[in-house]
């Protein structure tokens, strides 16, 4: 199951995000996620297996011009993460699908994904 995160989920997201992003402390992530959620430009989606959070995605709205798009705002996938032991099971695809649907519900026509 993938669910759209709420403010009560900030610590859960930070505990996953610290495994992906280079930060000094988990509190730094908690503060950033809290600030993002307060602006309402960010959406987070959490993948659960049974009751264990195993992955997440963060989407932001961008209002500046984004090459290749013809609308504003544009959804921007800031990051997607799945715990190593849960990879290769289609969970990232499931999280991405939920993120895309979350952007559609906000009338956002484009979701920008930059991957490496």
Sequence positions of predicted segments:
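Active-site rim helix/loop that mediates acceptor-substrate recognition in acyltransferases
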Residues: 25-48, 58
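Helix-loop element at the rim of GNAT/NAT acetyltransferase active sites that forms part
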Residues: 14-28
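Conserved GNAT acetyl-CoA-binding A-motif
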Residues: 96, 103-115
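A short beta-loop-alpha structural element at the N-terminal edge
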Residues: 1-13
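Conserved beta-strand in the GNAT
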Residues: 46, 52-61, 76, 81
């Amino acid at each position: 199951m993938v669910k759209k995160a709420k403010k009560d989920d900030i610590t859960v997201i930070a505990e996953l995000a610290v495994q992906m992003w280079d930060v000094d402390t988990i509190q730094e992530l908690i503060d950033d996620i809290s600030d993002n959620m307060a602006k309402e430009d960010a959406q987070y989606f959490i993948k659960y297996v049974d009751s264990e959070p195993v992955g997440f995605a963060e989407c932001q709205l961008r209002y500046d011009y984004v090459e290749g798009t013809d609308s504003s705002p544009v959804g921007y996938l800031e990051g997607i993460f799945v715990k190593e032991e849960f990879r290769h099971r289609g969970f990232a695809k499931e999280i991405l699908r939920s993120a895309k649907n979350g952007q559609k519900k906000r009338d956002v026509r484009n979701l920008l994904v930059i991957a490496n």
